[in-house]
Amino acid sequence: MDKLIIELTGCDRSGKSTLNSAIGEHYNREYGIGKQFAHICVIDRWLYDSIALDRYFNRVIPEVETARKQFLLDNKDRMTIIWTYASVPVLEARQKEQKGLDGSDYNKIVIDMQKMSDIYKELFDELGKDLDLQIFDTDACSPEEIVESLIEQGILD
């Protein structure tokens, strides 16, 4: 394993935090967003997500987006980006299931899952071939199966 940073990215309700928890369990640690282990830092949403979410919310500052992309490209040898996705109907069902459970204002916002999914796909088309970007369909595989795949690929140890 030679990566220092693992960024978990993807639409809302695509399984990023659940995967983060599974990675933590793999390392026998408590769950934590951005949990730092002795040799890697796992970040639940960071630069890749910032680019996608700025596009989604129409708040793109071109110079900032360019700088974020350049940072990702400059550090591609030290980073793995894990894109979790699910079909739009599954994302919408997960959103309905979650809505209001934690009482936060966030869950009162209805996210257009199709638009968000399209933005992530667009960003993948732009950057995917130049980055270490792993893609996992959380409809088809469990967090534990994803962790196992990451171990087999040498991304996790």
Predicted features, each with a name:
Residues 11-14, 18-59:
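Conserved substrate/cofactor phosphate-moiety recognition/catalytic segment
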Residues 57-65, 71-122:
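A glycine- and Lys/Arg-enriched "phosphate-lid" helix/loop adjacent to the NTP-binding pocket
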Residues 36-39, 89, 139-146:
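A short acidic, often aromatic-flanked loop/helix-cap motif at beta-alpha or helix-coil junctions
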Residues 2-5:
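Pre-Walker A (Motif I) flank of P-loop NTPase domains
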